[in-house]
Amino acid sequence: MNHGGNTQAVAPMDPNSIENRYGVDGSQTQKYSYQYSTGSESAPWTGHSVENQAVENGNYSNSNYYHPQPTGPATGNVQEIPNTVSFTISSTSGTANVAQDYSGYTPYQTSSDPHNYSNTGYSNYYSGYQQQPSQSYPQPVGAYQNTGAPQPLSSFQNPGSYAGTPSYSGTYYNPADYQTAGGYQSTNYNNQTAGSYPSTNYSNQTPASNQGNYTDYTSNPYQNYTPDAANTHSSTIATTPPVHYQQNYQQWTEYYSQTEVPCAPGTEKLSTPTTSAYSQSFPVPGVTSEMPASNSQPAPSYVQPWRPETDSSHPPSQQPGAAVSTSNDTYWMHQAPSLQAHHPVPPQNNYQSPLETKPLYETPFQGHQRATYPQEMNSQSSFHQAPLGYRQPTQTAPLVDSQRVSKVQIPTNPRIASNLPSGFTKMDKDSTAASAAQAPAYVSVSMPKPKDHTTAMSDPGTFPKSLRGFVERAFARCKDDKEKESCEVALRKIVKKAKEDNTLYTRDWDTEPLSTVTTTNVTNSESSSAQLSSLQNKSPTRRPKSRWEPLVEGKPFVKPASTFSSAVKFGVWNHQNENNKKSSESFQKVDAATGFKPTYSGQNSAKKSFQRPVKRQRFSGGAATAIDDEASSDSDKDLTPYYSSAMALAGSAEEKKRRDSRSKRFEKIQGHSRGNDLTKPKNANVGNLHSRRATALRLSKVFDESGSRAVEDIDWDALTVKGTCQEIEKRYLRLTSAPDPATVRPEDVLEKALIMVQDSQKNYLFKCDQLKSIRQDLTVQRIHNHLTAKVYETHARLALEAGDLPEYNQCLSQLKTLYAEGVEGCSLEFAAYSLLYITLHSNNNRELLSSMSRLSEEDKKDEAVRHALSVRAAVTSGNYVMFFRLYKTAPNMNSCLMDLYVEKMRYKAVNFMSRSCRPTIPVSYIVQVLGFTGAASEGTDEKETDGMEDCLEWLKTHGANIITDSNGDMLLDTKATSTSLFMPEPEDAVAHGDRNLDVNDFFTRT
Amino acid sequence: MAYVSMGEAHRRITEYLNRFCDAVSYQDSSTLCRLLSFSSNSPPLLSLADALNVFQDSSSLIRQSDRFSEYGEILAHVFRSLQSYRVGNLVEAYLAFDKFANAFVQEFRNWESAWALEALYVVCYEIRVLAEKADKDLTSNGKSPEKLKAAGSLLMKVFGVLAGKGPKRVGALYVTCQLFKTYFKLGTVNLCRSVIRSIETARIFDFEEFPRRDKVTYMYYTGRLEVFNENFPAADTKLSYALQNCNPKRERNIRMILKYLVPVKLSLGIIPKDELLRNYNLHEYTKIVQALRKGDLRLLRHALQEHEDRFLRSGVYLVLEKLELQVYQRLMKKIYINQKLSDPARAHQLKLEGIAKALRWLDMDMDLDEVECIMTILIYKNLVKGYLAHKSKVVVLSKQDPFPKLNGKPVSS
């Protein structure tokens, strides 16, 4: 029911995207919406989360963070608290949201993640979310509040974006009611998407306008967005009444009213908020004080949340445009620019809310804020402490505050942290890596509102404060939802235009007449802008989600009906997203504990998703992420239907397996989709949005089709990546998700890269890294030809040269299969290596026999093979003289493999000699026989003496007894030596087996 | 394929069903064996297969009577397997037989006495043989052979059924031997270790209690494993046990054992009589034995080269290669004896130069360094007693027993 209601509601809200998504399945719709939203929605989620957070903050942060938003969030939180009764459901929805957030996060990653988390938390608020959120939230709140207070005003200006957030909140509500957070989410997504993740919302709702809005949003929304998050929270609260949700959806279009409505229900009655509340809240957001008011009434708070979301979404969208794409980084970045502060705040809020949320929320905003502030402070600190887990959430919060940002991962909420830790760490890294982009964002964030302005200015993603104020004002003028809607549309257009004119930052928004909002009321324009922003945000988010989503798809979501269903969904999301065990675990936990645990899982998944995105970003940069987002959104859509079932099955190992396989499949598909997306410009956000949507649609279709197909039936050939990267140098990074064609080099470039490596004068570590990346690209593109063989041969030789046996073994095993496939290469050379390796290092008789029996008469005529066979004979008989002669005449790299046996052979030889010879052996003889003169030596005197020194040194370290005769010649006293000889422990033994590889090189490399 | 009328087909199938059920109810193991032994290609089974191809709905016949349907699952799989086997679809035959074997083992588990042990042996044997054939088919079709591996895990399961305290435990060694055959064929001999451990350490098993033929097979395979490990004394013990206990009329089996026992004995310094090699057609060792007797290094190398493939495949190449040191020892002994004849006073001083010359006569071109190296090894390994005076390039032999015989002890490492 709820789902259906949600979907329906959503449809109205976002006719295009939402309807599509929702329209697909009543129950599934939610899922779909999730999925979609994941791509784009994910952003929304983030937005939601942000909103939620904001809401939470709202109470606290509203003033602090985006004052408007915070209030919204605060209310949201408050509402949620009231909703607690429904919590189970809401919690589930919360989880779902979280999951979505995650996916969404990918784009906005960090920020969105946090948001998501916070969102989850919000949704949880209903049930247990608050707790979870509280953890993270508190932190964010603290930060947010700080920033928020200043920003809020500015953010208020952004009301439009907030409007977007309301939709998010709506989603939240839906989840709460539905438990099918999905439905809510979808709605939210639409709204959110519109606001934050342009993709979803935009695609459906106001694609074109969204873009415009986006820009606008970016400027304003960011700040506002945080409030949106708050709204989301409120919306979650709203969850109680499904009807509200529907309203919300509808309202979503009119964000305010809708959001408010949900919020009201969710939050408690807070403000019957719906439209009026929203509108109120929006204005309120502008003023922190208002926020409190809104807090008292959920509706207002919701409105604020929306704004925050928009803000967040905007920043994300803008940022996404930038290379920051990396999920976490991007998120951070995005948030950082516009919403950064807001987003982060929302998470904080969420976290806080869990902790204190209820009380705080319930209490007037101001009061809440106070309470939250402390919490925030705590949370911040906690964030810092446990940055890893919470960082993602926090990161969003951090975005808000530069400090927070720096701390980004501060969000160490124990629960979240536990789940997220790994991700957070990564996040941290990412954040650091992203530092350039993120740092600014963070700074801005830290500077609460003022910073926002600055950030907005500095960062294209962020909107100027003045613009936010303008939007807020416009929204404030809206009398009802419809007005807001129209106002939003108008605002979007304005912002878009401004963006196109490059006057976004130069125009004096403070003096801009609200009449410019034209057609509809200012409010409408604002709302539209919010949608846009949300859409922008969503698009990036969605992609990340989609990646995860594929996994989710695997799980059936048939069971959403149960109270936990929403949680289940969330869990499912997590599962899907993560494919990770954690998600499943979390699900189980959720089931048991209901809301809270699910949320956590959601958070975890979100974190995970973030992490992955981050990695990607590293690889491919912004464009790649965008593509990913799209793909993810698609997958999310597909997944939604499965959620319920997935929930049910999540626990079982079988399901896990299936999920894994599915996730793999999805990854591939995603990769494929990315391939399609390649043409899309990475940086052009607006352009990207459209293209993304298109791709998303395509992808979704693909997914729908593929969903019904068995993995075995998938035409992998059609999914094989075709690289487009023209960079010759590329660092190796282990893929954690489907490869991005934009970062994969095609064959001709790889050929150049190989030549570059071969000619390079740099050290082995560099070459190894480069070759590994070449190998990866070859593998990803399924290239099996002479080039592949050449690359592996080159690498194997280099590895031999450097004594890197593990790497050599990898290459050799690949080469064996390549040669077996008939690929031409230096098969005999490597047959010789293989023989030597077995003889000298593995000492396995059966293996040696079988590899010898594989050699044909023809093979044995090859010089290298013949040499290797002779070496083998010398070694098995212990003929050290022969061994060292062969060592000097070794062809190819045979001597490199022999190198590694020289020590043993010498020891053996001296042992033989000292036992058999009496009374003495001249050291000079040992020098000569045991190859101390060096393989290349021509027997010159200088080298001779060098060899003598080396030999003496060697003998001494092995306990030999040296005496000097009357002529001054050094002699080995064999009798004494025979009992004192020992094999010293290798002093310079290193784990990687080669002392030539400086440990510090390894560290610098990583 | 001879034409079979529907009625005839019906009759044959019913007859088979009757015989199967009779065999089970009267616990007639030998009849049951005949009914299941596909690879025997016995006429009754072939005609039954033809009948099954004519009369497709054999399952209805099974269902007809309660008597048959009690073993309906077993019989249905047998029929399907036999049918596929008859038309040459070995992979299908294997799959059906695998199902049958599982059902049969399940049934066997429920029978308290071990009356059907022989029938179980047949099943184990058939599944392994069928899997090998199916793998051959798969390989020729370019697919990866995996049936033998699957058969291995089924056999392992059977082993688990038999490894208990009851009377069935005497069957465990047969299954173990089938497992050995499977693993040796697959080249995964390391998997043998777990089975060996349970046979040799589990208290429920008394090795002497097992049937002799299984004990011989078991010793043969474990002896081969010891050859791989170059643990010659242990290999000698096991293979000798197998040789002593195997049916003297089974010359093929004796030859298989000797193929490993001869190299093992050689490396322990025990040289077989030429008749033995002749009687059991072990001519590939003839030259090697000669080389050892004569100290003819060149002959040894030629012999190794001549049969390299065979030795590599059977896994004795490395063992035979190591005989080189014994050949050197023999050569030194000959030089020493020679020298003793010409110059008894300095007979115990072998000049490296002289050794190098002797080697050159054998077409082994070595310089003094290499000769010295070999002498140090010989002395180190205690094949020559004495010491090497590096300065004067002379090997000073011990006055007492300068060339100790191995006498069943391996060359020290």
From Swiss-Prot, chain A:
Family to which the UniProt record says this protein belongs: Belongs to the SAC3 family.
Region (Disordered): 1-75, 106-162, 183-239, 266-326, 516-550, 595-638, 650-690
PCI domain residues: 804-978
Protein name, per record: SAC3 family protein A
Subcellular localization(s) per the UniProt record: Nucleus
Positions with biased composition (Basic residues): 609-618
Its biological purpose: Component of the TREX-2 complex (transcription and export complex 2), a muliprotein complex that functions in docking export-competent ribonucleoprotein particles (mRNPs) to the nuclear entrance of the nuclear pore complex (nuclear basket). TREX-2 participates in mRNA export and accurate chromatin positioning in the nucleus by tethering genes to the nuclear periphery.
Record's keyword terms, sorted: Nucleus
Alphabetized PANTHER family for the sequence: 80 KDA MCM3-ASSOCIATED PROTEIN, LEUKOCYTE RECEPTOR CLUSTER MEMBER 8
Biased composition (Polar residues): 26-75, 106-115, 144-162, 269-282, 313-326
Ranges of compositional bias, category Basic and acidic residues: 653-680
Low complexity: compositionally biased ranges: 116-140, 516-539
Organism: Arabidopsis thaliana (Mouse-ear cress)
Summary of subunit composition and partner proteins: Interacts with EER5, SAC3B and CML20.
Coiled coil stretches, renumbered: none
Origin: domain of life: Eukaryota
GO biological process: alternative mRNA splicing, via spliceosome; RNA splicing
Consequences of knocking out this gene: No visible phenotype. Sac3a, sac3b and sac3c triple mutants show no visible phenotype.
Gene3D superfamilies on file: 1.25.40.990
Curated annotation (Swiss-Prot), chain B:
Subcellular location: Nucleus
Tissue expression pattern: Expressed at low levels in roots, leaves, stems and shoots. Detected in seedlings, roots, leaves and anthers.
Domain PCI: 216-402
The keyword Chloroplast is annotated on this UniProt entry: no
Gene knockout outcome: No visible phenotype, when grown in absence of ethylene. Extreme ethylene responsivness, when treated with saturating ethylene concentrations. Curly leaf.
PROSITE patterns, A to Z: PCI
One term under GO cellular component: nucleus
Gene Ontology annotations of biological process type: ethylene-activated signaling pathway; poly(A)+ mRNA export from nucleus; response to ethylene; root development
Predominant cellular place of this UniProt entry's protein: nucleus
GO molecular function term, any single one: RNA binding
Annotated S-S bridges: none
UniProt keyword annotations, A-Z: Nucleus
Highest taxon listed in the record's lineage: Eukaryota
Biological role: Involved in the regulation of ethylene response. Probable TREX-2 component required for nuclear RNA export. The TREX-2 complex (transcription and export complex 2) functions in docking export-competent ribonucleoprotein particles (mRNPs) to the nuclear entrance of the nuclear pore complex (nuclear basket). TREX-2 participates in mRNA export and accurate chromatin positioning in the nucleus by tethering genes to the nuclear periphery.
Assembly and binders: Interacts with EIN2 (via C-terminus). May also interact weakly with CSN8. Interacts with DSS1(V), AMPD, SAC3A, SAC3B and At5g61290 (AC Q9FLK4). Interacts with UCH1 and UCH2. Interacts with NUP1, anchoring the TREX-2 complex on the nuclear pore complex.
Protein name listed in UniProt: Enhanced ethylene response protein 5
Species this chain originates from: Arabidopsis thaliana (Mouse-ear cress)
Gene: EER5
